[in-house]
A protein has these predicted regions:
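Phosphate/NTP-binding elements of NTP-utilizing enzymes
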Residues: 1-138
């Protein structure tokens, strides 16, 4: 592996924006760049519909699962939205070359070969179990 390739892989691991651009062919708006690079434990967004909130959350969840193994929990207001968000995560995951093998894959969660799990749940406390993330929470 060349020094250039090592540098690119390090950039992908350290910078979710580089990962999104190079591995997912996604060009982020400025607010999405700030969100993807943020280390804040909680962020509030004031965005219009169809602005890319779910897409950005999917990229953040996938980056976390690949480069920071553990549980990545994605919580959406409804079951339908949580499934849509997870579908975006899977669409991005399946676009990565070389393919990242999955140990488990179903409608609302997957487990990567590095042991990371991505779980997408509705935010309604009546329909959610007591899953607690050990890693990042999106």
């Amino acid at each position: 592996m060349s020094a250039n390739e090592i540098g690119r892989r390090l950039a992908w691991a350290l910078d979710p924006v580089s990962f999104a651009e190079d591995k997912l062919n996604f060009v982020a708006d400025q607010w999405q760049r700030q969100l993807l690079r943020s280390r804040s434990p909680a962020i509030m967004l004031n965005c219009c519909r169809q602005s890319g909130k779910s897409t950005t959350a999917a990229i953040a969840a996938l980056h976390s699962a690949i480069y920071d193994p553990g549980l990545t929990l994605c919580v959406s207001p409804s079951l339908r939205q949580s499934r849509e968000l997870f579908a975006k995560v899977m669409l991005f995951l399946k676009s990565i070359e070389p393919v990242i093998p999955l140990e488990e894959d179903n409608k609302s969660s997957c487990e990567l070969s590095n042991g990371s799990r991505i779980v997408s749940l509705p935010g309604d406390p009546d329909t959610r179990t007591s899953t607690r993330p050990s890693g990042s929470c999106v």
